[in-house]
Amino acid sequence: MAKKALISVSKKEGIVEFAKKLNELGYEIISTGGTYNLLKENRVNVVKVSDITGFPEIMDGRVKTLHPKIHGGLLAIRDNEEHIKALKEHGIEPIDIVVINLYPFKETILKENVTLEEAIENIDIGGPSMIRAAAKNYKYVTILVDPKDYDTVIEEIKQYGNTKEETRFYLAAKAFGHTALYDSLIYNYLIQKNNIEFPEVMAFAYEKAQDMRYGENPHQKAAFYKNPIKAYGIAECEQLHGKELSFNNINDANAAIELLREFKEPAAVAVKHTNPCGVAIADNIYNAYLKAYESDPVSIFGGIVALNRTVDVKTAEELIKIFLEIVIAPDFEEEAFEILKKKKNLRILRLKEGYEKEYDLKKVEGGLLVQEKDEIDLDENNLKVVTKKAPTQKEMEDLRFAWKVVKHVKSNAIVLAKDGATVGIGVGQVNRIWPTEQAIKQAGSKAKGSVLASDAFFPFPDVVEAAVKGGITAIIQPGGSQNDALSIEAADKGGVSMIFTGIRHFKH
């Protein structure tokens, strides 16, 4: 009895060549619909599923392979006498290889203006059923869902007369991953259509983009996975030059891109260890970068710079003056790109347009914290001047700028800004006075005339007192402390204006 392979694929890559090789190795090919027609046109020896089942495709192809002669052939345990007896009694022949990839549900829902009905029609039923049946019976059946595995299967059949059990076991696991991804796409699409923000079950499936050399540290193994639907941000950056991105590169670049999105005007963001070390806006990208660099010329060394305008020659010439890990921008002038390429190891990334909202996830031991991203805008109507003195227009511009930056600094966070640039950043301290002192010390003489943004309220007036002493002229903070009155009193005493936003921006 000839061995049998059932082939039904939506992605036709390499399938004709694979089927022909199976023919040469003595396999009878069974197929359906478009795959059958393609194989037949290319002179592959193939029979229709309906010829095996004795039952036609019905309901516009919704029912094709859901038949005992297919699933019995897939699920029969070959060394079980009762199973073999059942096969013979019902005229069922074993199926040894199954090659399937599923209806293009992902591609369908990514189309513009796709209807729910169109999406539903692209939910595969027979395909996942056959994949699961074949994978369950991996000891006897080889299941293929990825064209990358075709050559391995052919080589093993040539060498051993069949695939090795360890290969079948691996392919079975891969097959269940394939259906898990498929089901998660359907589930999340339908949850979205039901407008459910936090469903009873969280089902995420990501596709591996690359293996990393190592993780956050050299002793940690790591890989990078992409969202198969929401393609944007660091996951979709195009690398134009330089070494492969590391785990930390990707993490830091992501932080830089998230902060960069806060600004519509030309902006430059420098990041180290996911924290901004220099941020600036200006009338052009060259000036924005110069201001960001001058914010902290020490910490930017070995950092990541993200820009939201095309990099010109002048800017490129400045960028190569120091060691940077990565430069990110929406585009690069040709000559500017050639200048940057002189730095052999500099990673150059082109940031593509596009952004989609998704959950902010935090892994904890034994669980997952899920929340909306912190993307609330500053509502000018809700700003409350709580001091006798109000900020000037120039101070107000810097306060808005500093507020955007402080949201992206690890708590407890303080940002000092002046003339559209950070001059001091206090990062990740366990009380509020220490990051204030850190930021003022870093700013030095630039602290005088700057403004201060705090990610959370002041529990004591000491922050305001330090700000007054450092020459800071205006403060923006959430407010809401039991001691707000003391902080307001200190601000009035020091001649400093202060605004409450009513919004906290903790970042952990």
From Swiss-Prot:
Metal-binding among keywords: no
E.C. code: 2.1.2.3, 3.5.4.10
Record GO terms (molecular function): IMP cyclohydrolase activity; phosphoribosylaminoimidazolecarboxamide formyltransferase activity
Gene Ontology cellular component list: cytosol
Pathway: Purine metabolism; IMP biosynthesis via de novo pathway; 5-formamido-1-(5-phospho-D-ribosyl)imidazole-4-carboxamide from 5-amino-1-(5-phospho-D-ribosyl)imidazole-4-carboxamide (10-formyl THF route): step 1/1; Purine metabolism; IMP biosynthesis via de novo pathway; IMP from 5-formamido-1-(5-phospho-D-ribosyl)imidazole-4-carboxamide: step 1/1
MGS-like domain: residues covered: 1-145
BP terms from Gene Ontology: 'de novo' IMP biosynthetic process
Keywords of this entry: Hydrolase, Multifunctional enzyme, Purine biosynthesis, Transferase
Reactions catalysed: (6R)-10-formyltetrahydrofolate + 5-amino-1-(5-phospho-beta-D-ribosyl)imidazole-4-carboxamide = 5-formamido-1-(5-phospho-D-ribosyl)imidazole-4-carboxamide + (6S)-5,6,7,8-tetrahydrofolate; IMP + H2O = 5-formamido-1-(5-phospho-D-ribosyl)imidazole-4-carboxamide
SMART domains named in the record: AICARFT_IMPCHas (SM00798), MGS (SM00851)
Gene3D superfamilies on file: 3.40.140.20, Methylglyoxal synthase-like domain
Domain notes: The IMP cyclohydrolase activity resides in the N-terminal region.
Homology family: Belongs to the PurH family.
Protein name (database record): Bifunctional purine biosynthesis protein PurH
The species this protein was found in: Thermoanaerobacter sp. (strain X514)
